[in-house]
Each structure stands twice: as C-alpha cells, then as structure tokens.
C-alpha cells in the first residue's frame, strides 16, 4: 500500500518517483526546492494530508524536498493526527546497541525498511539513563518498556518506558521487588512480570502493571494461566500468556539466538549458524531443526570493524512436522569501528506499532 501511495503523491507533485532518493543525506533534509505549480496546489490540505498519511514515515525526508508546501505539511502535527484517524499504522524494529564502551548510555536505533535500502539509523536524543543489564523488554503500541535488570551490579526495581513517537524516555513507578531476567508478557493491555527475584515467597511470585492507572499489583499463580520454570530466558519464552517450561527439551539458549512465538510454535533462530530450531507445543515435545539460510557463515567482525546484518525471514507450515523458512532479504545495516562479539554490543530489540 505504501509504495502505491508514494507513486500517487509523486505524480500529483508533478515529479517522477525516480527523481527522489529514498532517504537523503542529513545535510539535504534542510533544503527545499522551489517547484512550479502542481496538481497539489489546487487540492485542499485535508485531501493532501489524507494522501501523505498513507505513505511510510521513512519516505518523509524525500517528500520534504518536493517543495515548501510538502515540507510544511509533513512537519505539521495534523499529519500524525490524520494517520491515527484513518487507522494507518506501521511496524518499526528498534534495537539497542552499545557501540561505545566509554559511554554507559547505549544508543537506540530503528531500522528503515525501505526496499533495497534497509539500514539502521540512530534515534535522537540518546538514552538518558544508564542502561540496566539483564532487563526485560516488552512493547505496547508505540512504547517499549524496560523492566528491572542490574544497575550498578544490583537488582533493580526500576521501570523505564521509551516513547517511539517522540523518542523520549521517562521513568514509571517502581516494581515492588527488584527483578532480573524476569519473564514478561502483555495480556489484555496489562504487563505481567514473573520471576527474576531472589524471594522464594509465593506472594512475591509476580506483579502486573496497568498502563492506564500507572500502578503495580501483585499476582499469584492462580491469577492468570501461567506456569513457572527454574530459569526464565529474559521475556522470550512467553506464549499466549503462558511461560513455557523448556526443562528437558535440551535447547541451548544464547545471545546469538532469537526466540519467538509464531502460530503456537516456539522458534529459536541461530543468527551465526543459519539454523532454525523450532518446537510445536500442540504436536510434539521435541525440538526440530531446519536449515533456513542459503549462507551458513556470517562474519560479524572484519578488518577492525563490526558489521551488523539484518534478515527478514518468513515461515510457512507445510504438512505435519514441516516448517519452511524463506529469507525475504538479508544485508548489512550498520558498521562501526572495533571488533566485538555480538554479545558485547547487542543488548535488546523490540517491534513497536504506530
């Protein structure tokens, strides 16, 4: 939808799509060209905004170069209000990277999903707080919640939220107990947090946060349909409101793997080895292994530089016990000086919708 709307916008602006770069350099974004009158000049602003609202946000820097009228409309808060009114949303991938070891505040980046030009761009301003290690991340709408973790080597009750619309970070009310590597899930608009504390008292088993009232309440094993496990992988082994016990399934979880739930299947993807390991909770109790990458080797470090690669993989069921993976695209999205392993700089990722 976004591509077709973009072509319509360029047509009405009196220019061809190929005349504009997908994402201009930063020094070009402040420039605007004086264009002759176009079809847009005779259209009401409401209709123009309705058209622009259907175009991906990542094309806005290019559209701002069309003329001063476009630049003004794109900067107007009415554009986001129009998107909200007509129900246009996009999924945005955010990643948190520690690319500078001398800076205790890591940077958040977002992936620009423009076809053939995918790249990671830093958000501004940078993260204002010291980033807790072993924290848990969940997202609701356009906000990413950062729950607990180690701060100055101590378990923390702190909860932060990053608003991905404004790129502003703020603190929320603290949890009742400090928690590290807790499991978390969003159920009916509320954030359930389980485990991660030293307490063995069942009264401290978990707690739930209500974003509407901004309050925490304790939860018990009978409050919601949840089951505990001895070692909870940070917020990843949560499916449909249940924390699944993987004990005995012989799955090795590490920082080079991504664990997600798709259609009631728990999928673990090994980034460096190009291997997909998956588990279907309805059909079997064993982990199955599938090869999903054409390229099985991946160089994270090269000649004193670190390269970050990103891939989009679509999964498809094909009969009993079969899961096929297709690499939609795969490319380098970010490079910085220094040779580190992925666990040294990659902290967290989250998908937000707005």
Swiss-Prot record:
The keyword Metal-binding does not apply. The keyword ATP-binding does not apply. Residues 37-86 form the F-box domain. It holds the Pfam family Kelch_FKB95. Kelch repeats lie at residues 143-189, 190-236. InterPro entries: F-box-like_dom_sf (IPR036047), F-box/kelch-repeat_ARATH (IPR050354), F-box_dom (IPR001810), Kelch-typ_b-propeller (IPR015915), Kelch_1 (IPR006652). Keywords: Kelch repeat, Repeat. This is Putative F-box/kelch-repeat protein At5g03000. It comes from Arabidopsis thaliana (Mouse-ear cress).
């Amino acid at each position: 939808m976004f591509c077709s709307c973009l072509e319509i916008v360029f047509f009405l602006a009196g220019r061809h799509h190929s005349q504009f770069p997908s994402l201009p350099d930063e020094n070009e974004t402040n420039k605007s060209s004086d264009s002759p009158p176009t079809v847009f000049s005779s259209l009401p602003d409401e209709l123009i905004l309705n058209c622009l609202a259907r175009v991906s946000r990542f094309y806005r820097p290019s559209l701002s170069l069309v003329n001063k009228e476009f630049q003004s409309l794109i900067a107007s808060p009415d554009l986001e209000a129009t998107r909200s009114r007509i129900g246009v949303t996009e999924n945005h991938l955010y990643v948190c990277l520690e690319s500078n070891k001398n800076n205790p505040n890591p940077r958040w980046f977002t992936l620009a999903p423009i076809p053939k030009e995918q790249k990671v761009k830093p958000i501004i301003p940078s993260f204002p707080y010291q980033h807790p290690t072993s924290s848990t991340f969940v997202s609701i709408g356009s906000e990413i919640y950062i729950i607990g973790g180690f701060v100055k080597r101590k378990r923390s009750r702190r909860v932060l939220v990053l608003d991905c619309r404004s790129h502003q970070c703020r603190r929320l009310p603290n949890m009742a107990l400090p928690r590290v590597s807790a499991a978390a899930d969003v159920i009916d608009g509320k954030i359930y947090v389980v485990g991660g504390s030293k307490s063995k008292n069942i009264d401290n088993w978990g707690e739930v946060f209500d974003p509407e009232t901004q309050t925490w309440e304790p939860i018990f094993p009978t409050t919601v349909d949840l089951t505990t496990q001895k070692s909870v992988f940070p917020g990843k082994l949560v499916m449909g409101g249940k924390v699944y016990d993987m004990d005995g399934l012989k799955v090795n979880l590490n920082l080079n793997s991504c664990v997600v739930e798709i259609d009631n299947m728990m999928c673990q993807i090994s980034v460096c080895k190009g291997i997909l390991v998956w588990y279907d909770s309805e059909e079997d109790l064993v982990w199955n292994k599938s090869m999903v990458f054409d390229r099985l080797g991946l160089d994270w470090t090269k000649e004193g530089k670190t390269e970050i690669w990103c891939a989009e993989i679509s999964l498809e069921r094909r009969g009993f016990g079969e899961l096929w993976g297709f690499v939609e695209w795969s490319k380098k999205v970010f490079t910085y000086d220094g040779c580190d392993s992925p666990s040294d700089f990659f902290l967290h990722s989250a998908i937000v919708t707005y």
